[in-house]
Amino acid sequence: MDRINTSAAPPTSPDWERLRTDFPLLQRHVHGKPLIYFDNANTAQKPQAVITATDTFYRRHNANISRAVHTLGTEATEAYEATRTALATLLNAPTHELVLCSGTTFAINLIAYSWALPRLRAGDVILVSRMEHHANIVPWQLIAERTGARIQVADILPNGTLDLDALHTLMTPQVKLLAITHVSNVLGTVNPIHDICRQARQRGITTVVDGSQAAPHRHIDIPAIGCDFYAITGHKLYGPTGTGALWARREHLHIMPPFLGGGEMIKEVSFDGTLFNTPPHKFEAGTPNIAGFIGLRAAVDYVRRIGIEQIETRETELLAHLTEELQKIDGMRLFGTAPNKAAVVSFMIEGTHAHDLATLLDLEGVAIRSGQHCAHPLLQYYGVTATCRASLAFYNTHEEIERFIAALLKVRKLLG
């Protein structure tokens, strides 16, 4: 299959302006103004390497995977499995412990119904944090309703950090599962996930980590983290939508029943019963998003070529600049000021509504998120119904931050 060379060693000092030109959509104008895309926690833009990889698959190699011996089928299967290998390398995890799926939401539901549902009983506790995305709350509520288990919530401190003392106190013998985000999608808080998982493991608590917001911005080392499950989403990692992965310990994958039934997840079928495939394919029923996963492989290679440490350094600098400028604005309220943060800033300006700000900013060519960010309990903690969220990626610039602040001041004046 045609290869795109995106696996070269990271440069000593990336040329961020040149890398920005790899993203076609960033060249757009919106309402006659150059686009400022500050909604990267929602989804990241795609480099040309990803677009080309997906297009090339459909033009030259389109076939189903694991179902044919012809050349196209072999090429498609090899390219698809190469994505599993690339993700395993990114996460420092074995390929046979990596389930390819549509994203973090699917991954967490897979854990909920294949691992938790058969094991939890009345009186057991599922522990979550206040800062979780709904995808790491609602599945556990559904499981609790069916099993009689209870959900307990570890709260946060006013600056948006997790209350670690409270979390450790809640780790009682009744807790069977801890589901926690690595990085908050609203606050940007980077949780001390290594310590949290170590504490949980010492107490015999199974850990589920939502890594959706972490994988694009932080180095992930699964063995070092020490969790039981780790889920990521491809479209936030500069890859196509409908892609993602679940890493799970081998011992869990072997005892978990399939979540969905169909082709690929079986070895043999008769009317007397079915012999299931081995993990991870046991959990990959049906035809997947083949082109999407081939695009995801290109995205992973692209990120590795830049270097995730370089990306983190770049985004930390951008975050410091953005935060400093926002703090100069009268009436500004920032949500989440943890010392260890990803490049996410949620904010409100006194006397304005988040949706009004975001709508008028769009007319200035600025794309940010407004609303509750799929985190209702977190916003309830802060006593607000909505916030604005600006989230950055390495391809954003200091000049964009200055233009964003100018646009924000203009909009604020319009709103009185």
UniProtKB/Swiss-Prot annotation:
SUPFAM superfamilies on file: PLP-dependent transferases
PROSITE patterns: AA_TRANSFER_CLASS_5 (PS00595)
Keyword annotations of the record: Pyridoxal phosphate, Transferase
Catalytic activity: (sulfur carrier)-H + L-cysteine = (sulfur carrier)-SH + L-alanine
Modified residues (N6-(pyridoxal phosphate)lysine): 236
Gene Ontology terms: biological process: cysteine metabolic process
Signal sequence annotation: none
E.C. designation(s): 2.8.1.7
Cofactor requirement: pyridoxal 5'-phosphate
Active site: 374 (cysteine persulfide intermediate)
Transferase as UniProt keyword: yes
One Pfam family cited in the UniProt record for this chain: Aminotran_5
Class of this enzyme: transferase
Any GO MF annotation of the entry: cysteine desulfurase activity
Family: Belongs to the class-V pyridoxal-phosphate-dependent aminotransferase family. Csd subfamily.
Purpose: Catalyzes the removal of elemental sulfur and selenium atoms from L-cysteine, L-cystine, L-selenocysteine, and L-selenocystine to produce L-alanine.
NCBIfam families: sufS
Protein name (Swiss-Prot/TrEMBL): Probable cysteine desulfurase
Organism: Xylella fastidiosa (strain 9a5c)
Source species taxonomy: Bacteria, Pseudomonadati, Pseudomonadota, Gammaproteobacteria, Lysobacterales
